[in-house]
Amino acid sequence: FMQIFFIRTIKEGYTGCPVIVRFIQLQTPTTQKAYAAVHKDYQVLAKSTSGGAFTAIADAVFAQDGIVYGVAMMDNMQVKHIRTSNKEEFAVLRSSKYLQSDTGNTYQMVEQDLKQGKTVLYSGTPCQIDGLRHFLGKPYERLYTVDIVCHGVGSQAYFDKYLDFARKRYGNIKTLRFRSKEYV
């Protein structure tokens, strides 16, 4: 039933998850390339939750006077995409968030940066990357994207309800880590 539903909706113009759409359109398994990496600097590795690969890629972009967009947990526990232009600003993008982030006006900002000749790195879920590409309407040679593995990320609204529960039970929440290395 599920496959029939997706095939029917694709024919009717379904534009949902790009991974599901691509899989159903192909209808045959394809070989994909996958890469694994770990940052060489132990300090970066210790501050990162997924090996520090994003930091290494971002460093290469910053070395070209480029711009890096990624997801930050704001002080109010909202998860948002932000623009960073140096390593100091980038530090808040480290660590996993496990929530669908608010892209805000970052697509417009990316377009502006690209039109100014900047190298741009944008990290997000596959649907966010697909949304960025559709927004831009054409490929850009200086745009690099990192699609994080999506496993059905949770919504901010649901997370806010959890935070309300946690605040009532434990009091004020100062920091939050989804994958803490404190006890490793």
Regions found by a protein language model. Give the residues of each.
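Iron-sulfur cluster-binding cysteine motifs and their immediate structural context
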Residues: 1-10, 14-29
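Iron-sulfur-associated redox domains of electron-transfer enzymes in respiratory
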Residues: 25-184
